[in-house]
Curated annotation (Swiss-Prot):
Binding site for GTP: L16, A17, G18, K28, N56, D74, D109
Family affiliation: Belongs to the MobA family.
UniProt-recorded name of the protein: Molybdenum cofactor guanylyltransferase
Source lineage: Bacteria, Pseudomonadati, Pseudomonadota, Alphaproteobacteria, Hyphomicrobiales
UniProt record, GO biological process: bis(molybdopterin guanine dinucleotide)molybdenum biosynthetic process
EC number: 2.7.7.77
Gene: mobA
Organism: Sinorhizobium fredii (strain NBRC 101917 / NGR234)
Catalytic activity line of the entry: Mo-molybdopterin + GTP + H(+) = Mo-molybdopterin guanine dinucleotide + diphosphate
Top-tier EC class: transferase
Length: 218
């Protein structure tokens, strides 16, 4: 059986922010929601859950961000798609947390993701070497996942050969467990905790949810 976690009992995490943000029109990491950048918001939500946080910025040449978290480039430059970021996350985790069996990934554009994300994904591992993936409302959220570091070499060769590089297709190659997260009950109705903010209009909607949520802890 593989260790479910790092030595601290918490896993390392990587925020996936290496996309083009073409629908938003400007980098989503720097977009403001409730007066805070999306990156700061995601880091704030993730910090109590994990052992360490790095940020995948695709072609970024490395170094630290203003928040002090390391920025990591894709390990295979020029291959589009989020799996390039997942691979970079696996390689990074192997370096910074040699005892860890998995790395958690969280995309930059889902500002209300659960505060129990890491604990519930880790707790769902059965044998210990599976991918644990978040679901809500009957839909898979494949970038909210705990990835076993042992499958990094398989991902490395698979993304070089499979042109579509679909995240779901890669998950289907391996043992996985699904973890269902409930909607968040608010006075204004149910909120999908994985609400995705890709466009300026969705950003406005997220701002409205934030105002409604002011009194309710999520
Ligand atoms: N490293 C890396 N990450 C990516 C790439 N494309 C998408 N991602 C990440 O995958 C996640 C989901 O992708 P999208 O929601 O489509 O984000 P996006 O590609 O920035 O936005 P669009 O250009 O509007 O599709 C985001 O967290 C991105 O940062 C890529 O080419 N390389
Ligand atoms: Mg998105």
């Amino acid at each position: 059986m593989v260790d479910k976690t790092s030595d601290s009992g918490r896993c390392p995490a990587v925020v996936l922010a290496g996309g083009r943000s073409s629908r938003m029109g400007s980098p989503k990491a720097a977009v403001l929601l409730g007066g805070q950048t999306m990156l700061d918001r995601v880091i704030e939500r993730l910090s109590p859950q994990v052992a360490s946080i790095a940020v995948n910025l695709n072609a970024h040449s490395g170094g630290a961000l203003p928040s002090g978290h390391p920025a990591i480039a894709d390990t295979i430059p020029g291959l589009p798609g989020p799996l390039a970021g997942v691979l970079a996350a696996m390689r990074h985790a192997r370096q910074v947390a040699p005892g860890a069996s998995h790395v958690l990934t969280v995309p930059i554009d889902a500002p209300f993701f659960p505060g129990t994300l890491a604990a519930r994904l880790q707790g769902a591992l059965i044998v210990g070497d599976e991918i644990a993936v978040a679901w809500s409302l009957g839909e898979m959220h494949p970038l909210f996942a705990l990835w076993p570091l042992a499958i990094a070499d398989d991902l490395d060769s698979w993304i070089r050969t499979d042109e579509k590089r679909r995240v779901r297709a890669f998950i289907a190659r391996h043992a996985s467990v699904a973890v269902d997260f409930p909607v968040v009950a608010t006075k204004a109705g149910p909120l999908d905790p994985f609400l995705n903010v890709n466009t300026p209009q969705q950003l406005e909607e997220a701002e409205e949810w934030l105002n409604r949520l002011e009194d309710s802890a999520i």
